[in-house]
Amino acid sequence: MAKSGKDKFRIKSERLPEFISKLEDLTKISDSIKIKIESDNTMMYSILGKATVLAFKNYNIPTSELFEVKDDLEYGIDIIILNAKKFVKNLNFLKENEKVTIEITHKESQEDDTIMDARALQIVGGKLKVNWIGGEHYEIKDMNKKKLDQGLNIKNSRWSFNIDKSDFADIKKLSSINGDRILQIGVNAGKVVISETAAWEMEIDTIDAERSANLILNKKFLGCINDSDSIQFHIFDNFMLVKHEDSNLMLSFEQNWDEEDE
């Protein structure tokens, strides 16, 4: 019979707003989120697409910086949060100046005896208790941090280009005006141009003069890109990657952006 049990952690008050903000950001990809808690690292991510991953974003936070954990965990804990947008809205009523705890009721994974699958969560802060039922393990594709680090290593990218902060802000504003869902990213003789068909175009970078390419970017993912002084897009064979200090945003080329994929 599979083992079951509970774990209770305190969420560090100084990290609570950031924790909620990161969860909210992940809901821009999908309304389902997976959190993988291990002794050294906590990874949370969201995926768009079932058989094929169309978009993926994750955050990594050292577990000791997010939770107060008395001892090293002897196992990993996987939490699947369905209806994540509603979950996050509930968490926004937690107050930073109050002690906030998360209690996880779990059972041993059928596929890996070193992992516990969360069955239920209870997050308590002051007068508020947020109760949530954990999703089934098959409802979100499992992503391994080690394999992700290898697969998203920018050393394996083919080429890259940059967009500075002010240009990116203008691109988001221009994109909100016009009706197309798709932005074109064109490279001709090393000049990188982002455009919207029959509406506008903007030259945003100059790279290797011999480089030519044509890519597409769905506007809906502009809001998933974290702000920074310079945003670098790394181009791989089948996807583009925007990497920040504690996050990765992967957007696949292998899609047609049909509405049913959303």
Language-model-derived ranges and their functions:
Residues 1-27, 33-262:
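DNA polymerase sliding clamps and clamp-related checkpoint/processivity subunits
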